[in-house]
Amino acid sequence: MSWDELRSTAVQVRAPQPIGTRGKLLIAGDHLFLSEPGKGVHVFDNTDPKAPRAVMFIQIPGNVDIAVREGHLYADSFVDLLVFELDLPNRSAKLLHRLEDQYAYDPYQTLATDTAVHVEGIDKTKGVVVRLEPVQSNAKVAQ
C-alpha cells in the first residue's frame, strides 16, 4: 500500500465488522475498545455489560496499540500516530490529526505467520507491506 493511499483513504469509520485476531481491550465510560492488530479498532456500547453491542469499526491499517482519553482515541498506523475525536452517542469518530513518522517502520509487522520469512526488496519509499504474495524461487537456502 502506498504512503499516499495509507494516509489519504485507508482509515475509515465503518459499520461493525466480524472480529478476527483479538488485541488490546480498553474500557472507557460505557464503551469497550478492542483492537484487531493490523486492521483497526472495534467499538462496543457496554451500557449493559452482560450484552455489549458492536457500534462501529474504525479501520486503521497497521494498528497495534490504542489509548482512549477524554473523548479521544489515540492509535498507531504503521509509523504514524492518529488522533480521533469520538462522538459515541452518534456512533462516529473523526480523524483529527495524523502525526507522521513517529515510529520506526517494521516491514514484518503485519505478516502473521508461524514460519520464518525473509522479504527481499522492500523499498520503504514506496509504502508499507500489508500482505505476503508467495513467489516460486529456485534459490538454495544455506543450512
Segments predicted by a language model, with ranges:
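Feature marking well-ordered beta-strand scaffolds used for ligand recognition
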Residues: 1-143
